[in-house]
Curated annotation (Swiss-Prot):
NCBIfam families, A to Z: SA_tandem_lipo (TIGR01742)
InterPro entries: Csa, Csa_sf
Record keywords, A-Z: Cell membrane, Lipoprotein, Membrane, Palmitate, Signal
Record-given protein name: Uncharacterized lipoprotein SAUSA300_0411
Lipidation (S-diacylglycerol cysteine): 23
Signal peptide positions (record): 1-22
GO cellular component, one term: plasma membrane
Membrane topology: Lipid-anchor
Chief location of this protein within or outside the cell: membrane
Amino acid sequence: MRYLKKLAWFISVIILGIFIIGCDSSSDTGEKAKEDSKEEQIKKSFAKTLDMYPIKNLEDLYDKEGYRDSEFKKGDKGMWMIYTDFAKSNKPGVLDNEGMILNLDRNTRTAKGYYFVDTIYDNHENSYSKNYRVEMKNNKIILLDKVEDQKLKERIENFKFFGQYADFKSLKSYNNGDVSINSNVPSYDAKFKMSNKDENVKQLRSRYNIPTEKAPILKMHIDGDLKGSSVGYKKLEIDFSKEENSELSVVDSLNFQPAKKNKDDE
């Protein structure tokens, strides 16, 4: 009888031990599930703005709130800065770069910026840069400076930002990225292989002269806190470059920052 009681007690201890271990294990699994990988954190940080794409009417940004911190003055509704450029090196040591930057002030509901044309040499001696002032009204780009080159004028007036036609609803499907982190800045980078079947890639090929059939790399770069920062920035690059010494890429960014600056910043 005593033997049976000891056996029953021994079995009870074993079952209790298994139950406790099982609880700890499930708890650890739960904790790990809560802690996203850096890759997931980077994608989630970008998703805050990429989920708004495509922004077919840029004036919708006047009614969109962004990340706010202590850098914003009281009453400042903030400003959206949208940017797209296309960079291409037609010959070694020379980079041609064209694009536009537009600042949409939510306080005044006005949008001003410029279209830029840059030719950059490695030695910088003969580098060339020209800006053409623009504004946006009724979702239409209006050229404020006189432009003699008719083709350039048409490119400016018909310009579309990447964010106006890009669609990243399937951002979660980009996996197995190459992630690098610089804790001193801090800055975060993630690279993902894209497919030529990707709709964003097809859109870019239809709008820009991209002679290579090479599938591009999607590069995500963040300066500042992953959770958000008005002094940091995020940059998206779709890189079609064949090799290290050549450059063929589209860069896009959409950032929210204070519209009213401190006197010390001016």
